[in-house]
Regions:
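Nucleotide-sugar-dependent
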Residues: 215-226, 241-242, 246-248
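Cell-envelope/extracellular polymer assembly enzymes that use nucleotide-activated donors
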Residues: 292-295, 324
Length: 339
C-alpha cells in the first residue's frame, strides 16, 4: 500500500503530541511493508495530488493546506486523523454551550464529509465532533501511538522513586493554562516544577521526577498525550473535564498495565488504517446524528369541516418531512374526536 501522510509540521520540527503520534504511525505502517511519504501541507499542489493518483492519503493537521487541495482530495481516498477541532473557525468548542457551535462557525464541512473516515482520539473528542457535524464517518481510535522504544523508556522511568510534588507542562500556548496549573498547586501549598525539553526522552525523565501531574486546559483536549504519559509513568493526574483521555475506561490504569494497553492500541489503530484503505469503510463508526424534528402544535376549529384544506396546506411545507404534527383537542365546535 502506498500512502502520503500530509501534515502542517512533523516531529523533527515540532515536539508536539500530534507530531509524535504521526511519526509513530508512519513508522508502524512502514514496518508492515507499506510505503509512506511525508509531505508538508503547505507544499502540496494539485499537480502533486494528480501525479500520485494511486496513493492513499492520511491528513493530519491541515491548517496550511490550500482550499483547492481540500477540494481535489475529494476524488481520492483519504482519511483525516483529527488532532483538534479544525471544523470550527476558532478551533475551540469551549466557546459554545455544550461544545456545540452555531452553523455559522462550522468550516471545512465538505472536507470532513468527503473523507473515508475521521479518526478521533477519545470518546470525548468524537462526541464533540459528532455533535457539530452530522456525519457517519467518524471513528474513535481511543488512544495514541508510542514507539516500543518510548514505551520501554517510560516503563523504566515508572519504576523510579518519585518526589512529592507536581509536574506542570511548561507551555507558551495560552490554552494549555500553565499559569492556572501553577496557581492550583499554590492553592494547595504544594511544591511544583515546570517541565519542558526539546528532547522527548529528556522531557519524560523530567516529568517523572514528581508523583503528580496537573493539567487544566482551557479548551477541550482531544486526548492529551502528556496526561496519558503521566499515567503510564505511574503518576496521579489532576485535571479538569476538558481532557479527552479521562473519558476512556483505560485511564484508570497506570504504569505497566497502561503501557501494554497503549502498545496494543497502536497496532489496532494501524489495523484500522489498513482496513479503511483496503475496504473503503471501517467498522465502529458513530451513527449519523439524527437532527431533532420540528414539532408543530395546533388546535382545530370545526376540524371535521376544515381538516382537508388544513392538511393539504401543511404537507406542502418544504420541511414537512422533518416535522411532527401534534393536534391538541381544544374542545371547539365540531366532531373533534373523529378527526
Amino acid at each position: 500500500m502506498q500512502i502520503i501522510f500530509i501534515a502542517d509540521f512533523f516531529a523533527d520540527e515540532i515536539l508536539g503530541g500530534g507530531e509524535l503520534n504521526n511519526e509513530v504511525l508512519a513508522d508502524s505502517l512502514r514496518r508492515r511493508g507499506h510505503t509512506v511519504v511525508e509531505q508538508k501541507s503547505s507544499h502540496i499542489t494539485s499537480e502533486y495530488i494528480t501525479e500520485h493518483w494511486d496513493y492513499n492519503f492520511i491528513v493530519g493537521n491541515f491548517v496550511h493546506l490550500p482550499e483547492e487541495i481540500k477540494r481535489s482530495l475529494a476524488s481520492f481516498s483519504y482519511i483525516i486523523y483529527e488532532h483538534d477541532h479544525k471544523y470550527l473557525r476558532n478551533r475551540n468548542p469551549a466557546f459554545f454551550s455544550g461544545y456545540v457551535a452555531p452553523p455559522s462557525e462550522i468550516i471545512n464541512e465538505e472536507f470532513y464529509k468527503n473523507a473515508l473516515g475521521i479518526f478521533c482520539q477519545s470518546d470525548f473528542h468524537y462526541k464533540i465532533l459528532h455533535s457539530n457535524l452530522s456525519l457517519d464517518n467518524i471513528k474513535n481510535v481511543a488512544g495514541n501511538a508510542w514507539s516500543d522504544e518510548s514505551l520501554e523508556h517510560i516503563a523504566a522511568l515508572s519504576s523510579e522513586k518519585k518526589q512529592n510534588g507536581f509536574s506542570i507542562l511548561d507551555s507558551n500556548i495560552s490554552h494549555k493554562n500553565t499559569l492556572g496549573a501553577a496557581r492550583y498547586c499554590e492553592s494547595l501549598n504544594a511544591p511544583y516544577e515546570f517541565v519542558s525539553s526539546r528532547n522527548y526522552h529528556d522531557f519524560l525523565k523530567k516529568l517523572a521526577k514528581n508523583d503528580k501531574f496537573v493539567f487544566l486546559p482551557q479548551t477541550p483536549e482531544t486526548l492529551s498525550r502528556v496526561a496519558v504519559e503521566a499515567r503510564m509513568l505511574g503518576m496521579q493526574v489532576h485535571t479538569n473535564s476538558r481532557v479527552g483521555a479521562a473519558s476512556e475506561k483505560w485511564f484508570s490504569l497506570k504504569g505497566v498495565e497502561l503501557i501494554e494497553k497503549m502498545r496494543l492500541r497502536r497496532e489496532e489503530i494501524v489495523d484500522s488504517i489498513e482496513s479503511i484503505f483496503t475496504t473503503g469503510r471501517c467498522s465502529h463508526f458513530t451513527p449519523k446524528r439524527e437532527l431533532p424534528k420540528i414539532s408543530i402544535l395546533t388546535s382545530l376549529y370545526k376540524g371535521d369541516e376544515h381538516i382537508d384544506g388544513f392538511m393539504r396546506n401543511m404537507v406542502r411545507q418544504s420541511v414537512f418531512d422533518d416535522c411532527e404534527l401534534i393536534i391538541v383537542d381544544a374542545n371547539s365546535p365540531g366532531d373533534e374526536k373523529a378527526v
